[in-house]
Amino acid sequence: MKKQRKNNTEKMKNKKISWLAKAVYAAAAILAVAPTANAMHIMEGYLPPAFCIAWGIVCLPFLVFGFRSLNRRVQENRRSITLIAMAGAFVFVLSSLKIPSVTGSCSHMTGTGLGAILFGPCAVSVLGIIVLIFQAVLLAHGGLTTLGANCFSMAIAGPILSWLIYKGLSKTRINRRITVFLAASLGDLFTYCVTSVQLALAYPSAQGGVTASAVKFLGIFAPTQLPLAVIEGILTVVVVIALESFAKSELKAIDFEIEEEKE
């Protein structure tokens, strides 16, 4: 009797997880047919060839370690595939939402904070570059020549900061939800800071050089990106709460500490 109840409970949990995953994938499918726009990703052909090659080389070690990390997790526990796929879909959905800025540019959330919290920054680099390739080829969002630069800012630099913030604050008495919020939102903002520096290095200002140029690019992104970072932080907290409610066994399988257990 107890075994039957346990099986029924497990089936209910799997149904809830499946429903959550389907909801994320449905949103991704809807956004896949959205009209294109000039967004935060550095567009095709915008960077000089030398910069494209350099940023691509910088990304390679992270991608290698990330692939090994994901492969190891899947080999250790096949059930982690669901969370990995969900984290990737979360990146795609949020990074496809293009919000026009009053400065004439567009901004969007990154969604990489969730994956960094669950799997670490290197693993997110793989998820991020898959999303970036898909967006560049099918949505005209970003570009293949600028793939290295976009990958470094969105899928490497931002997730690293998110992971560091999460790990650092997790050792304190700060509430878990606040920790997740800060990790996701500040990681999002840092992505735009890195993008601004990348553009400034390629196109320094005639007066003030790289620093002045970076400040100008930051000024273009800031009006929309600041509120978007807050929204991303809130959405990430909501997803983590949902996972802690419906996917406890999957979270334990990847050694993620559940809030109630921490308390």
Model segments located where?
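Membrane-helix interface motif
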Residues: 34-38, 196-208
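Hydrophobic transmembrane alpha-helices
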Residues: 36-114
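C-terminal transmembrane helix-loop-helix hairpin of multi-pass membrane proteins
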Residues: 179-189, 209-263
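Alpha-helical membrane segments and adjacent membrane-interface helices in multi-pass membrane proteins
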Residues: 95-158
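N-terminal secretory/membrane targeting signals
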Residues: 2-39
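Short helix-perturbing small/polar motifs within transmembrane alpha-helices
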Residues: 153-196
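Hydrophobic cores of alpha-helical transmembrane segments in multi-pass inner/ER membrane proteins
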Residues: 55-64, 155-165, 230-241
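Hydrophobic alpha-helical transmembrane segments
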Residues: 53, 81-86, 125-129, 152, ...
